[in-house]
Amino acid sequence: MDSLSESSTSSYHGKRPRSLSEESQSSSNMDDISQKSISLGDASEISKNLPSIAEQKQLIGELVNNQPELELGQVDNYILSYSWYERLCSYLAEDGPFPGPVDQEDIADLETGTLKPDLQEEIDFTIISRDVWDLLVRWYGLKGPEFPRETVNLGSESHPHLVVEVYPPIFSLTLLSTNAVDANESHKPKKISLSSKSTLEDLLEGVKYTLSLPSDQFRLWRVDTDQPLHRTIDPSSFIKINSKEIIDFLEKSKTLVELGMDSSCSLVAECMINETWPVDRALRLQFLIQQRNNQSSNEEQKQEKRVPGTCGLSNLGNTCYMNSALQCLTHTRELRDFFTSDEWKNQVNESNPLGMGGQVASIFASLIKSLYSPEHSSFAPRQFKATIGKFNHSFLGYGQQDSQEFLAFLLDGLHEDLNRIYQKPYTSKPDLYEVDEEKIKNTAEECWRLHKLRNDSLIVDLFQGMYRSTLVCPVCNTVSITFDPFMDLTLPLPVKQVWSHTVTFIPADTNLTPLAIEVVLESKAATIEDLVKYVAEKSGCSDYRKILVTETYKGRFYRFLTQLSKSLLMEISEEDEIYLYELERPYEDGSDDILVPVYHISDDSTNSANSYMSSRDFGHPFVLQLSDNEVTDASFISEKLKLKYQQFTTLKNLKNIDSLESLELGHEDEQVQKGPLDVDMDHSQTPLFEMRVFHDRFEKIPTGWNMSVSNLPLLTERDKKDLESTVDPLDAHSIEEEDDSEFKDVAPGSYPEPSKSNENTKLTAKENDRLLIQGDLLVCEWPEKSYQFVFSVAPSSPQMGRSLWLESKTILSDKKDDSEDSRTITLNDCLDEFEKTEQLGEEDPWYCPTCKEFRQASKQMEIWRCPEILIFHLKRFSSERRFRDKIDDLVEFPIDNLDMSMRTGSYKLSEKENPKLIYELYAVDNHYGGLGGGHYTAFAKNPDNGQFYCFDDSRVTPVCPEETVTSAAYLLFYRRKTS
């Protein structure tokens, strides 16, 4: 199974990569894995040693900027979970909660302690230096295994290609045994791991040691089978395995990469017994048995004779992207005939500096001959892959690749190896600045002639066409017409890529009801800023900068999305709760205002008055915006809180109620205070709710994840303490391990946050007057009676308030989200989309020769010249900024009689009656699954019998032509029909 990356794996020379996955196979070096984790008891020590966010940024930045170059053979690279890495980045950007310990469990096979297979760089993991790794583990602790990795050279000494070996090959070892008892052993095979740059001699020594072989008299078989092997196997079972080959011991000095053994595979060791190989003896015995049944065997062989061209390709480890493209290409009749007849040898160009010395053409010819040999049911293209990888390091390892990118590289390599031009002349492509049919035709012919002066091969004859591009200046209407060759035609799919979500908007005006706003944005790469502007327009908010975007979870803030232009909406999943709060005024960096998150809990009266461990969340949190003057007045803070609470209850005079006793007596009007609340009221009066304060010195706007409400100080007590006492953060805000289940189990991780309080930092005189400072969070604790009276679900008295927490007005979008509509898309629709006029973006303007300025010109594409073999690349994968997506919609395409005549510019302008451009389908390259984990297969029509077959790596089955039209179709191969 393959995962797909729209771009090729990056290659790094010398400098350490930010993340690199040149190797991507099923296991990791088990000798390098050490299980390290941190207990809850260790968390306190870690959090005390954690520097401030600014200090962390500085220290990590210095290490990254001064990191050394990659050194061959050094194990100084570490694989880091990308999901934890993103949480860290969000935390350091003050955009998310504390990330918890370095959590590797999502990328680790916890049963074996190894790295999970098929992981993708920059999606599943990133790679950091040892120094950065050590720093992160010291600061945050470690949860799960660590994965140190070695630097290897996948190039040559003269042209080094240093990479981090993410997946060193692991070899499963099976011993061939003639002992009936041993041969029936069902234990799993033993395994050894080596670097891909180890030699064959290193491998042989490892096999001998691991299997405890008594002597050097053994030989090694490489086996490709879908059936799992056990620790031992008997000779009769072994010879039934179709795909196996003996490893040549004469090449002991060659590396595993050079031998094509740099991916994990199964090896069978066979020891000589009495100077006889057990496999040879078993084969002779099998031959004698077949001789006895010669006649029936001949009949069976006649019936089972394989059709040439129906040979599968073994998956060498994430190579189905290559296998599917090869099956499509090798079923091109003209290409097959050219290479099987050895005609290619007369045209190979070994001196072309842009070519591969004829090596790609040679290995491709060998591959085609193997695939069309009736002897093979399946073939392992190891040497082919090794040759391709030598010229393009992206395909050297076993990482996930794009089938279209591989095909483009292979066709270009074959073209240059077969280029009939030995001395390429200098040419200059003409441009046309007027719309004149005759001049357009002449310019197109000249462009093709010049192209052929430098590029002339069978590949050009078969696969290359030409398209016309027309640009029009929006200011002066200057027209520019150019012609360029293509090998395949990339077609956009006419599918709307929309982002839709229903969010909750809390107005600043407490007399207004919260709004549930349906958001539909016509770009999956839209930003938080796009969302805020949309909500501001729909809600009537005068200034979108006054809106604070948050994600909530179970009554708490999970993160604050303050990076408006940088954060993508696609980072928000369908189930995420998004709340947008309108502030009184814009809140920007440098503002004297502070934002204080407010949580609400109701006390269970069945517990003692001094215990807050049984408190429970209710409602949803909100945010108070307080100015410099407002944070010094406890009565003002209380009044402001009550005013905000009034937005969520039908009790509209809540701001005038000052105590629990006033509610119990039911004389609300008599209890109205004419002035502000006296903080030093009679202690016999129980306040409507108590304000408790939590501080986090690391988060500008704290989320309070994993905080305990036990022992939180009252806001008024904080005032009396003069805010100068130093409080041990973990003593004051410790994690309760017994009863506070409502707060412990809802968080993403189970580790405490670091240093929640002032940590030995005394406040200045100005700060000394404040009751609240930056990094504070309020927890309003409502006694049960207050809670029931103000936020009753079913009020028993007219004087009681009914809860409005769950009530909101709905605003539907005027844009319909039809992204899930089942409208049929055809190939013609895609061609229409390709031909549509579009405006260039701000980032890629065109220089107008008349205006002498860069302009966002209009651009239209048109096929001008159709090739004999027409390959359509359906653009199912999109990439905008950090977001990548796949379109899985079905595109219906014709199996026969695709008419391209009226879509081809040269045909439309031709004066004579040329034969129509009619095409028939002969191959389809399919991709199933998404970007994070998919698989390639192919449908191909046999050139001899006209039967379509499905090629799923080594498995080959016949199919009906209609079965080739699926939503997985990625590359379509058409051949022009001739008279």
Swiss-Prot record:
GO CC annotation, single: nucleus
The biased composition feature labelled Basic and acidic residues covers 721-735
Catalytic residues? 320 (nucleophile), 935 (proton acceptor)
Biased composition annotated in UniProt, kind: Polar residues: 1-12
Record keywords, A-Z:
Hydrolase, Phosphoprotein, Protease, Thiol protease, Ubl conjugation pathway
Q: Where is the signal peptide?
A: none
> EC number(s) per UniProt?
3.4.19.12
What Pfam families does the record tag this protein with? DUSP, UCH
Q: Which PROSITE patterns match?
A: DUSP, USP_1, USP_2, USP_3
- InterPro entries, per database record: DUSP-like_sf (IPR035927), Papain-like_cys_pep_sf (IPR038765), Pept_C19_DUSP (IPR006615), Peptidase_C19_UCH (IPR001394), Ub_carboxyl-term_hydrolase (IPR050185), USP_CS (IPR018200), USP_dom (IPR028889)
Which segments constitute the USP domain?
311-977
Modified residue annotations for Phosphoserine = 19, 37, 39
Which biological processes are named by the entry's GO terms? protein deubiquitination; proteolysis
One GO MF term: cysteine-type deubiquitinase activity
Region Disordered, annotated ranges: 1-36, 721-762
Q: Domain DUSP: where?
A: 51-152
The catalytic activity, as recorded, is: Thiol-dependent hydrolysis of ester, thioester, amide, peptide and isopeptide bonds formed by the C-terminal Gly of ubiquitin (a 76-residue protein attached to proteins as an intracellular targeting signal)
Q: Which PANTHER family match?
A: UBIQUITIN CARBOXYL-TERMINAL HYDROLASE
Annotated family = Belongs to the peptidase C19 family.
Protein name as catalogued: Probable ubiquitin carboxyl-terminal hydrolase 12
Tell me what organism the protein belongs to: Schizosaccharomyces pombe (strain 972 / ATCC 24843)
Instruction: Tell me the organism's taxonomic lineage.
Output: Eukaryota, Fungi, Dikarya, Ascomycota, Taphrinomycotina
